[in-house]
């Protein structure tokens, strides 16, 4: 574990000691090396925990998420270069330091063995994200978005802390490895139902569940590009990761407590997909599509069968790369036409034919078309939902149709049509941007060849 965390820590002095011209190059190239080093975690012969120390361990569920975190840091740095070049050198270095500290905290969160340690790190990721949104956001509403983000997360987290302390007193340990072997089960009572709610609510808000999702579109729309990327790709996955981990403890209760939440998430999936159809803001559309994809993950984690866990883990990784790619594309549009409104960006296919190809590929991946891993994740989830209740196939069908509709709407409004008159003096696509899109897309397609790497705990 130290071979990832220590080099990541050393990126901080590297950032501050590099000369202004070399800062971005140095940090990006070294963070790429770290992300390649993290791939060695995939060499696990079985599905047991791989202990690094008493504090840190990795297993088939946390490994793909750790690698995704390490993979996204260089991509975020590549995406942010253009948008930060007006800032002075100290601010640029501070921004890079925030991203690096966020990566370190996230890697430690995913590899923590103690639930209290996980909780502390889970909350600590809030601070750099909040600073990134409220300091480097584009519009003046960024403070409002930051406050929404902070309070939604904190309101969910306080009951979780109380619940974890209760479990510690009750069971005597919060170590995940020991908990998975304890035969301690919770009996059905009002207090235990409340304990279940307290444990799950923090993660459901983070996911986010439909109804407590209002912070997400706000935070996404106001965040700078790196903020949007890390929020969509990894911070939402903290919620689903926490839910899978804590479901060991709450075992028999989930069977009947999950019903309202599965129904709410399936209903929310259709509602948020429908909301996408009437968005005018490109980033907002991508944010709402994230909510509808994560609703599927919530439903599949709540069903608690091996297939549904596999589908949830696959869709988590697939959605992380896809939504991050879509935000990068939206940002490349924003840097040229200085507006997120979709109607202002008509006919871009005429000017940037290669970018239009990336738009098409990203939308098809978002639609879960083969050969992307989104398809596998959604197939696993659809099958496990269908075996849970036949009725869900109707909701899934409606959702697939609406997803197709908003993906078409997104492509047709931004890429097709007649060029608007205000588009003059547009910069061509940079190699940096095209490399960035490729580095998102290549893992998505290549993982199809060996999906067992990301199927999580049930290899």
Swiss-Prot record:
InterPro entries: NADH4_N (IPR000260), NADH_Q_OxRdtase_chainM/4 (IPR010227), NADH_UbQ_OxRdtase (IPR003918), ND/Mrp_TM (IPR001750). Keywords: Electron transport, Membrane, Mitochondrion, Mitochondrion inner membrane, NAD, Respiratory chain, Translocase, Transmembrane, Transmembrane helix, Transport, Ubiquinone. Coiled coil: none annotated. It comes from the Eukaryota. One of its GO terms (biological process) is in utero embryonic development. GO terms for molecular function: NADH dehydrogenase (ubiquinone) activity. The chain crosses the membrane at residues 23-43, 60-80, 90-110, 113-133, 147-167, 194-214, 224-244, 257-277, 284-303, 308-330, 350-370, 392-412, 434-454. It is a multi-pass membrane protein. Its EC number is 7.1.1.2. One of its GO terms (cellular component) is mitochondrion. It is an enzyme of class 7 (translocase). It catalyses: a ubiquinone + NADH + 5 H(+)(in) = a ubiquinol + NAD(+) + 4 H(+)(out). Its main location: mitochondrion. It is found in: Mitochondrion inner membrane. The keyword Secreted does not apply. Core subunit of respiratory chain NADH dehydrogenase (Complex I) which is composed of 45 different subunits. Belongs to the complex I subunit 4 family. Core subunit of the mitochondrial membrane respiratory chain NADH dehydrogenase (Complex I) which catalyzes electron transfer from NADH through the respiratory chain, using ubiquinone as an electron acceptor. Essential for the catalytic activity and assembly of complex I. This is NADH-ubiquinone oxidoreductase chain 4. The lineage of its organism: Eukaryota, Metazoa, Chordata, Craniata, Vertebrata. The gene is Mtnd4.
